[in-house]
Design a protein with these regions (language model features):
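Conserved N-terminal subdomain of the carbohydrate kinase-like
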Residues: 2-20, 36-123, 275-278, 287
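Acidic-glycine-rich active-site phosphate/pyrophosphate-binding loop
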Residues: 5-15, 31, 194-211
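Charged C-terminal helix
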Residues: 15, 63-66, 243-290
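Short pre-catalytic strand/loop immediately N-terminal to key active-site residues, enriched for Gly-Thr
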Residues: 16-17, 21-27, 207-222
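Short, small-residue alpha-helix embedded
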Residues: 38, 155-156, 218-242
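Phosphate-handling active-site elements
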Residues: 42-47, 206-207, 235-249
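Conserved phosphate/ATP/ADP-binding segment of small-molecule kinases
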Residues: 130-206
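Short, well-structured alpha-helical segments that form the helix of a local strand-helix-strand
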Residues: 168-176, 210, 241-257
Length: 290
């Protein structure tokens, strides 16, 4: 029996799309790889512009090869020209030249922009050149909708030492005021053994989001910052409001850590893995408004 060849046209259902501008992580735990995995897990189509190729695994960075700034800009333009992007996130931008070209591409674009100011890897390798910090602060952060620094990054941006929750609150407010943007200061690097608390400051909203701190195998926390900022961009692309998107992003990271999978060859080594039920972890977040 022959199958009939029917010439039919189907209008595909629209899906939200996000763009990540970041470095490639050969180990798969962070960078572009983590971003695209996070987009997909949350029902968002992912596009990308690669800024650098890193040779790394969850425990060490062996090498960083930055792309030419023009090559990064061309990737961004190619995506924005024809694809209906709903939100953008940036990660590792590495050099002043790349930062300036990315800023030129994004200035005309009126979309939610999540900036993860990546400076140092989990293993301690510098992922931003010294002269790039000034370009980040002068040319790029003014474009951000959200900035998502960890504690060491927030100390550099705010010019403050963070040793307590009140220090974190002061730093978040200072960053938000300086760049007129939302700030989520991530508390994963804090010294507390019990809780991981993030400070959220945006348009008069000030609160903390706290969860019990998980004690996990080596390598598991690699890529948490990338995953958080990508999840935030994904939920913004889907139209969630600010607080809903932030809470969902934190829940996604918590779930990814709690449901980590073993990937090591000859040692205990684990990596984050997207959670099956996000709502399970949203219920574990304590929200304190101030």
């Amino acid at each position: 029996m022959e199958l009939q060849n029917r010439n039919t046209t189907r209008n595909p259902e629209r899906i939200p799309v996000a763009l990540t501008i970041a470095g490639s992580d050969s180990g798969g735990g962070a960078g572009i790889q983590a971003d695209l995995r996070t987009f997909s897990a949350n029902g968002v189509f992912g596009t990308s512009a690669i800024t650098a190729v890193t040779s790394q695994n969850p425990t060490a960075v062996a090498r960083v090869d930055a792309l030419p700034p023009d090559a990064v800009a061309e990737q961004i333009r190619s995506v924005l020209d024809v694809i209906d992007i709903r939100a953008i996130k940036t990660g590792m931008l590495f050099s002043a030249g790349i930062i300036q070209r990315v800023a030129e591409c994004l200035k005309p674009v009126k979309l939610p922009l999540v900036v993860d100011p990546v400076m140092i890897s989990t293993s301690g390798t510098k992922l931003m050149q010294d002269e790039a910090l000034e370009a980040m602060m002068s040319d790029f952060l003014p474009l951000a909708t959200w900035i998502t620094p960890n504690i060491p990054e927030a100390e550099l941006l705010a010019g403050l030492t963070i040793r307590s929750s009140s220090d974190a609150a002061a730093a978040a407010e200072k960053i938000a005021d300086r760049w007129q943007t939302g700030v989520i200061l991530k508390g994963g690097h804090a010294e507390s053994d019990r809780m991981a608390a993030d400070v959220v400051c945006s348009d008069g909203m000030f609160c903390t989001l706290a969860t019990a701190r998980l004690h996990l195998p080596p390598g598991t926390s690699h890529g948490t910052g990338c995953t958080f900022s990508a999840a935030l961009a994904a939920f913004l692309a889907k139209g969630e409001n600010a607080l809903q998107a932030v809470v969902a992003a934190k829940a996604f990271v918590l779930g990814s850590l709690a449901e980590a999978r073993a990937i090591g060859k000859d040692r205990v080594l684990a990596a984050m893995f997207p959670p099956e039920k996000l709502e399970t972890y949203q219920k574990q977040i304590l929200i304190s408004r101030q």
